[in-house]
Amino acid sequence: MRVTIVTTWFPTNRSPGLGVFVARHAASMAAAGHDIRVVHLASASVDDGVRHDRVMGLPVVRLPMSLSRPHEVLAARRELTALTEGSDVVHTHAVSTLLPYALGRPHQPWLHTEHWSGIAQRGAELGSLARAGAQVVLRLERRPDVVTTVSDQLAADLRAYRPHGE
């Protein structure tokens, strides 16, 4: 199966520990015989300027995308269509990776893995302004075909945002 992983968390030369768990997950999928490609949407703070890379043996295309720069989010969205072409599945990781798909979903089946514990108890641990913003962003959790999480508790909290509680 050809899978394109789209993530905002992935190791760079500038930040080698960032998203190492996503890289390991991707490498394990490749070891199981899947054709894995990675698109890393890199914020300015971790972007090392390398656009084509290999991490843990995986081909990586790195696009600049800072959430505070809407033009970069839109540019990333435009490039994602071509970068995911030919994939059997698009697999996004983390809520921030949903933003480029706010205006249009991928053409392929879409799996999303959520890592953000900020959604716990509908953002109860966040300040009021952050909680309000999170509620808007979390509506994007309804868009993927399938959403999985990194823990049972996170799955329970996320069910409130999914159309049928799945």
Question: What residue ranges belong to the model's regions?
Answer:
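Hydrophobic anchor at the start of a short beta-strand
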Residues: I36, W110, G165-E166
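A short, charged, and often flexible helix/loop element on the N-terminal side
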Residues: R54-T81, Q121-L129
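Alpha-helix capping/helix-boundary segments
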Residues: S96-T97, Q153-A155
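Membrane-proximal helix-turn-helix segments that form the acceptor-binding/catalytic region
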Residues: G118, S128-V147, Y161
